[in-house]
Amino acid sequence: MKVLEGAVAAPNAKIAVVIARFNSFINESLLEGALDALKRLGQVKEENITLVRVPGAYELPLVARRLAESKKYDGIVALGTVIRGGTAHFEYVAGEASSGLGQVAMNADIPVAFGVLTTENIEQAIERAGTKAGNKGAEAALVALEMVNLLAQIDAA
């Protein structure tokens, strides 16, 4: 039986990180975790990482699509934070970010790792950005690298 499984180390991978500015006090912690994971665990060279800042989580899919269509990147990490408020705005932004990024991955055939926090409150977001619940930015970066390697294995099989 042949087993295909992606590894994390991807020293030659070209990775784009797209990060929302809105809720930057949380997103910057996600970014720190993602960059640390890419460089330290994934062994990705700094010159192979491109950072793109967008206004908010809603804008992540469009920019991710443009990056994917450029064919310059092996994987994309999308980072942002959407915190529930008193209106339906949360559902719209979180839903569009999630489905839009998924569509980019499927249509462009490129790993797009979802590092967008969707939380009930600020405390939950802070916990997921590097305190009690780990750093979801780092987790998303590792997912992107593993998927880059896994897709390469599938292509070579």
Curated annotation (Swiss-Prot):
Protein EC: 2.5.1.78
Tell me, what is one Gene Ontology molecular-function annotation carried by this entry? 6,7-dimethyl-8-ribityllumazine synthase activity
**Assigned keywords, A-Z:** Riboflavin biosynthesis, Transferase
Q: What is the main EC category here?
A: transferase
Locate the residues binding (2S)-2-hydroxy-3-oxobutyl phosphate.
Answer: G86, T87, R128
Q: Name the PANTHER family on file.
A: 6,7-DIMETHYL-8-RIBITYLLUMAZINE SYNTHASE, 6,7-DIMETHYL-8-RIBITYLLUMAZINE SYNTHASE DMRL SYNTHASE LUMAZINE SYNTHASE
Protein name stated in the entry: 6,7-dimethyl-8-ribityllumazine synthase
